[in-house]
């Protein structure tokens, strides 16, 4: 790709504000959602997307645990030492932050309040998993790392959940599910996976490739945790699968010159029944339908 076209593509991304990197999470979403989020919409529009309670559950569990266990945490390119507080105090701080974020609807607000009772038990499971993997090693969290592949115009950039000098850990929480019954809202546990999810393996493979440290993948709910330690050939395979998708995105941007009206002729329409699109507000939904002529 010539430099002029590369510059044009990067400038047109993020609603014309420009975007210069990919991430394991952006590469994990369906292609239509990628182009909606990172070509059609700018950062302000992305922030208007309203996440459901399950998306907040991960932060409610992981952020306090990081502050409780880690000696340093990276934020906005700088590192800080978390204040010495109990785990319960860190959780309460996170509750206060999440409570300021609008709920998606009335049901989501109820679920957000009901899920709080499961946060502390989940953090207790995370603490056990971290201790099993790292022992007494000094830990850091949220450090940015990146990879750059030949021929790919974008760096892939991500933040590590837990890290020591020799080891990394990627955490996935399984929030409580709620079901409406005649007697009201009923809660039931999400079982932990018997085998790692491929999307999570790709994320872990990225952090392994970027750090060359021993990687672990952890799943946790409010009752238990599971630790997976993939073999290196598995990690190499999943990393290449993630990079293959990055090249597909780049090729589509190159063919279309990052014009959404061309992308919508090359990429299948969004499946609005998928949870990936639940966070779009009504105006965004109409804009997306118009772009794909739905």
Stretches found by the model and what they are:
Residues 6, 87, 108, 112, ...:
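Short amphipathic alpha-helical segments that mediate assembly, nucleic-acid/protein binding
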Residues 196, 209-294:
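Metal-dependent nuclease catalytic regions and adjoining charged, substrate-binding loops involved
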Residues 61, 156-191, 207:
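Conserved catalytic cores of phosphodiester-cleaving nucleases, focusing on short active-site segments
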Residues 140, 163, 167-171, 215-219:
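A structural signal for short, well-ordered beta-strand segments and their strand-loop junctions
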Residues 182-220:
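Catalytic cores of nucleic-acid endonucleases
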Residues 1-164, 294:
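Metal-dependent nuclease catalytic cores that hydrolyze phosphodiester bonds in DNA/RNA
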Residues 50-53, 187-196, 230-232:
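Short histidine-centered catalytic/ligand-binding loop motif
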Residues 146, 174-176, 222-225:
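Short, solvent-exposed loop/turn segments at secondary-structure junctions
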